[in-house]
Amino acid sequence: MNFVYPIKDKEKIQAIKEYLAKSPRDLLMFTIGLNSALRISDILSLTVGQVKSGYVVMKEQKTKKTKRFPLNTSIMDVLVPYIADKCDDEYLFASRKGGKPISRIQAYRIIKDASKKCGLKDIATHSMRKSFGYNVYEKTKDIALVQQLLNHSSPAISLRYIGITQDKLDNIYEEINL
């Protein structure tokens, strides 16, 4: 699998949201991904009952750790009308075949297609999680907080994951003009 990047430009994020708005399901998936730090496998496993209170408690599939977090306004604005006629036991991102969520591959295609249409490359489902980490870091400059939110084992891993390390290296190369 190719390396994917966070989406650092908020205008590009907005452009992707506008593109995805034609499908409330796809827009909600992208919005939750950007605002929760969840991996795509955890996003796809969410049910209506897990989110309708506005607070999520779930066990992450990869780490088996319990994750708790409130759903912010960006998520709730898309979520509330989307789940209005859905039952608690329904998957949020149900496939058209019914009874199951869409596949990780389908989610990948949705995000990849939207990002391409908006002029971005090297963006995929994992970019949503990376974008969350990047934006938390940009807002707080607290890499320990980012590390905790992403369940990483070290600050260095988090910096590399969100693309900060490479950005700093690139800037040094650009600034040194001998």
Predicted segments, located by residue:
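Conserved catalytic core of the tyrosine transesterase superfamily
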Residues: M1-L178
